[in-house]
C-alpha cells in the first residue's frame, strides 16, 4: 500500500485511541492504556499487511452509501435502535449476496453494505444532517475499496473504515457548522457491567463459529446473532454484543490452531475498553469497530512479541 494511506489508517486509529482512552484518564488507567497502546502498535506493525492499493470501482461506494442510507432511514425515520438497524441491514446484505451465487452487482456486496451501515449509526448529536452521514458512508465504501489489501482478516476492519470515513467527512461538516456536541455515554450499573463482560466474551466466539465453522460468512455470522440480541437486550448492551462480534470476524489464519483463547482475550479486552471508553465526541459511526480492531491488534501484538506470527 502507498505510504500515505498506511499512515492515514495508523493516524486515525491513533487519534481514536488517544481520544477514547488516554486523554483525561487518571494516572493508573493512563499507564495501563499506554502499555496496551504499545501492544496495539506491535500488532499493527506485525499484522497490518499494507499491500498494494485496491481497485477503484463505484460499486462499493454506492453500496456503502445504501447501507448508511438504510440505517439512517430506520433510526432517524422509523426510530429503530442503531444496533437493530445495522444488524438488520447486515443480515439482508449477507443473504442477498448468498442468493446472488457469486454473480451480479451483489456478488461481494455484503461487506461494503455492512461498512456503510456502521457509518449510518452516527448519532444526530454528532452530525445533524443525514446528508453528511450519507457522504461518510460513501467515503467509507471508497476507503474500503482502496484498503482492500490491508488488514485482511482483522476483526474490526469494516467498522474502523466506517469510522475513518465519518471522521474525515465530519471535519468538512465542522467547517460548515454542521457538527454537534456529541452523544451522551451510557453509565453502566454494576449488574450491567457483569452482562457487558459476558457479552464481550461470548460474542466473538459465537460469531467466529458461525462465520468459519458453520460457513455463514463474517457478515451474517456477526449480524444474525447481533440482530437477535438487539431484540431482547437494552441498546448499550446490544452495542457491546455487536462490537464483540467484530472481534469474532478475525480470520483463523490470524489466530493459532486453537483460536478460542485468543478470541476470549480479545473479547475481554474489548469489554474493558468499552468500560473505559470516554471520547470527547461520542456517537461517531464505526467506533465499535475501531474498539474491536484495537482489541484484536493488542492481543496479536502480544502474541507476536512473545511467540512470533501464528504457526
What are these regions (language model features)?
Residues 1-42, 53-65, 71-72, 77-87, ...:
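C-terminal transmembrane helix-loop-helix hairpin of multi-pass membrane proteins
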Amino acid at each position: 500500500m502507498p505510504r500515505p494511506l498506511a499512515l492515514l489508517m495508523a493516524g486515525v486509529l491513533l487519534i481514536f485511541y488517544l481520544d477514547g482512552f488516554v486523554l483525561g484518564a487518571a494516572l493508573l488507567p493512563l499507564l495501563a492504556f499506554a502499555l496496551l497502546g504499545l501492544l496495539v502498535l506491535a500488532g499493527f506493525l506485525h499484522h497490518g499487511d499494507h499491500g498494494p492499493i485496491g481497485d477503484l470501482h463505484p460499486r462499493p461506494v454506492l453500496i456503502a452509501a445504501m447501507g448508511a442510507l438504510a440505517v439512517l432511514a430506520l433510526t432517524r425515520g422509523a426510530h429503530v435502535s442503531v444496533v437493530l438497524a445495522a444488524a438488520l441491514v447486515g443480515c439482508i446484505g449477507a443473504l442477498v449476496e448468498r442468493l446472488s451465487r457469486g454473480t451480479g452487482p451483489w456478488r461481494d456486496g455484503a461487506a461494503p453494505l455492512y461498512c456503510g451501515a456502521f457509518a449510518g449509526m452516527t448519532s444526530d448529536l454528532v452530525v445533524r444532517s443525514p446528508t453528511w452521514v450519507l457522504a461518510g458512508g460513501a467515503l467509507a465504501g471508497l476507503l474500503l475499496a482502496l484498503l482492500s489489501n490491508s488488514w485482511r482478516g482483522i476483526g474490526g476492519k469494516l467498522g474502523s473504515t466506517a469510522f475513518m470515513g465519518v471522521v474525515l467527512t465530519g471535519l468538512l461538516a465542522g467547517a460548515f457548522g454542521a457538527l454537534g456536541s456529541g452523544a451522551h455515554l451510557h453509565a453502566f450499573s454494576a449488574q450491567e457491567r457483569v452482562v457487558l463482560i459476558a457479552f464481550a466474551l461470548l460474542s466473538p466466539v459465537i460469531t467466529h463459529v458461525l462465520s468459519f465453522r458453520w460457513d455463514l460468512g463474517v457478515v451474517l455470522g456477526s449480524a444474525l446473532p447481533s440482530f437477535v440480541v438487539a431484540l431482547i437486550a437494552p441498546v448499550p448492551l446490544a452495542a457491546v454484543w455487536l462490537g464483540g462480534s467484530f472481534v469474532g470476524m478475525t480470520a483463523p489464519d490470524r489466530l493459532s490452531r486453537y483460536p478460542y483463547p485468543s478470541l476470549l482475550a480479545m473479547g475481554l479486552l474489548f469489554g474493558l475498553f468499552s468500560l473505559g471508553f470516554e471520547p470527547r465526541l461520542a456517537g461517531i459511526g464505526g467506533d465499535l469497530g475501531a474498539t474491536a480492531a484495537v482489541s484484536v491488534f493488542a492481543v496479536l501484538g502480544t502474541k507476536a512479541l512473545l511467540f512470533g506470527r501464528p504457526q
